[in-house]
Amino acid sequence: MKTKYRISVLPGDGIGPEVMREAYKILNILKNHFSLPLEIKEFNIGGAAIDQEGVALPKKTLLGCENSDAILFGSVGGKKWDHLPIDKRPERASLLPLRKHFNLFANLRPAQLYSELKYLSPLRSDIXIKNGFNILCIRELTGGIYFGKPTGRXLKKNNIEYAFDTEIYYDYEINRIAHLAFQLAQTRNYKVCSIDKSNVLNSSVLWRETVQKVSKNYPDVHLSHLYIDNATMQIIKDPNQFDILLCSNLFGDIVSDECAIITGSIGMLPSASLNEKKFGLYEPAGGSAPDIEGKNIANPIAQILSVSMLVRYGMNLKKIADKIDQSVISVLKKGYRTADISNNNNYLKTNEMGDVIANTLISGE
């Protein structure tokens, strides 16, 4: 491990600063209790940066991220900045440029339904079953139809308007995301399901062929393929059959949100975006939730689990990441809840949940 591991913390807007305060409790425990050599610096991002520095992604923030080993991100955006041009708003002008600047091509979205929270899932109880489910959706983030050229809108001579986008994938883009999926499968349950539409799309034919070739390097991992339409049905029908879902940009955008909603609370779900050097941006899967900003009722678990993902994938310290995850599970088993996951009015405030998880991590109970 490095003698110093530098983390740029970007709290952002809405509930971002509130849940980030709870993540700091975990970071301080990692420094002081587990003796991890963390160097933590905080920078402005999003609407907060617009208000204070005039732009959503200040040069100082970008430079700080360049000089770090990982980014811990909160959330950005809110109605306050909706009057700005779209490309100047916090969401478009901060997070997307960060992803592009650091070439964060792989998005990891765990979707876990804890057995203690199965009542939250919209799925029938016999589908969610007593042990819940744990899926990791791996989405290619920098290729595909969102970035393909040409794209645009036009008008034909007979006044018929039309629009077009281009789905394009290069084999190296598929190759690197596939290798990552198989490598992560070797740390989990040795199963990868690749999702495509190769019965219709040429880009999906290349996707399936490339993933199949890469799989030969990982004979211990079982590979299966599903068309996107069937995959979305199978996830609802029996999520337990899946471990890792490997998806293109468009399909991953759809599938990762589907996996998230069947857990019942997006406030529980972290995410990571990685580049080829395993530099990563770690953030909750949810948004800035301005409607509950300042009420001290936001769920900090997704932000805390984002720290766990940073430790697992950025620092490669699986055992310590497991301890953070286990602390969350232990707290849930004891019946502690925040407002979004409580089935009654007896719930903890944001800071109280952070304290309980932090104390559990220290005690190991």
UniProtKB/Swiss-Prot annotation:
| Chain positions of site Important for catalysis | Y146, K197
UniProt keywords (A-Z) are:
Amino-acid biosynthesis, Branched-chain amino acid biosynthesis, Cytoplasm, Leucine biosynthesis, Magnesium, Manganese, Metal-binding, NAD, Oxidoreductase, Plasmid
Give the protein's cofactors. Answer: Mg(2+); Mn(2+)
Species name: Buchnera aphidicola subsp. Uroleucon ambrosiae
Q: Per UniProt, where does substrate bind? A: R99, R109, R139, D229
Q: What is its main location?
A: cytoplasm
Record-listed NAD(+) binding positions: 78-91, 287-299
Alphabetical list of SMART domains matching this protein: Iso_dh (SM01329)
- Top-level enzyme category: oxidoreductase
UniProt subcellular location: Cytoplasm
Q: What does this protein do?
A: Catalyzes the oxidation of 3-carboxy-2-hydroxy-4-methylpentanoate (3-isopropylmalate) to 3-carboxy-4-methyl-2-oxopentanoate. The product decarboxylates to 4-methyl-2 oxopentanoate.
Q: What is this protein called?
A: 3-isopropylmalate dehydrogenase
Could you name the domain of life of the organism this protein comes from?
A: Bacteria
